Amino acid sequence: MPSYYLADLRIRFTENFKGCSMPELPEVEVTLRGIKGALDGALIKSIYHSDKSLRVPMSDDLYKLEGATVTKLERRAKYILITTTKGSVLIHLGMTGHLSVLESSVPRKTHDHFEMVTGSDVIVRLNDTRRFGLVLYYDIGDDPFSLSPLKDLGPEPFSETFTPDYLYARLKRCKKSIKQCLMDNAIVVGVGNIYASEVLFESRISPLRLGCSIKKKECELIVANIQKILSSSIEKGGTTIRDFEGADGKLGYFVQNLNVYGHDNEPCRICGTNILSCVQGQRTTYYCPKCQN
């Protein structure tokens, strides 16, 4: 079987977690890498989309991609952009979406809402139970990066733009909690609920502090830890992945490396104090009151 086949590349909920958690940057990056081998340079033989609406209804313009050749695949924040000779398609996994790379003989399931079949009879299929995902078509000549929803996004966490000086300048004007600031896609993309809690723990910064109270030295810690933790999660296959399996059979399970997220009322791995939780901006925050005092 060709090396690009994945037994079933999925982004799912982890049963250990308390509450819902959507795929974050590492999980989307792992997904992108998983589909690249099947799609990069491939001819798109056919397109399918269901008549169910996702976050917005899928356009029949997606069928324009039939007969196109895929020229580029990339990630921007939590979006996957697939560029072809006949336009582009932007995919967001939403809360429960996952992409699978499958043989053409695999039948569709109830919640399979979009698929591309290549000239090699390989299917890249989107399954989305809760239908909070997104599949958008951009015509030839459109620049997706200058259009919604990509145009107002902040810098990538691994980009040259995302520096301690940049973060310090942005936080000086931020009257929200530092946790909410890190989750603001206009400040930096891809740091979702799980990783914001973990980054602040690693940086020994209380999530209850205001963004404008963060010192420049602390910004250095935050930037370094965002990059370190996201990189580690990508290497391990992500956090919200329950059963990711690559072609080599290796599993990704960064959930085992989480220090605070999902561990409320459990002892801190560093000091033994019970982890606390609170709600900030309708999302649950986890922290150690001693280590992050």
PLM segments and residue spans:
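Short hydrophobic targeting helices and cationic amphipathic motifs
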Residues: 6-9
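Gly/Gly-Pro- and Ser/Thr-rich, intrinsically disordered tail segments characteristic of DNA damage-repair
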Residues: 15-137, 144
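Generic detection of long, well-ordered alpha-helical segments
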Residues: 22-25, 157, 161, 215-223
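Basic, nucleic-acid-binding surfaces and adjacent catalytic neighborhoods in DNA/RNA-processing proteins
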Residues: 43-61, 74, 166, 170-293
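Phosphate/anion-contacting hairpin/loop surfaces
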Residues: 85, 89-190, 195-202, 210
